[in-house]
């Protein structure tokens, strides 16, 4: 399943500056694994040491927040859009 992944500015160093990349995978976990295969180092910025989504990174498949779906097992149908959005904090 080919999906379009929108890459935030802070992670574009891993994608050669590309704002969008294509990835394969039937689930979000598969998409992240494919991203890592083609853009080494990006998975460590999205996943923690236990392989779970980092607390301050929001991921959407189409318009659905995966935290309220099936997490890393959320289906990524062909043609879906995946958005990686790091939380912004300030004080």
Regions flagged by a language model, labelled:
Residues 1-90:
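Ubiquitin-like/PB1-type beta-grasp interaction modules and other compact soluble beta-rich domains
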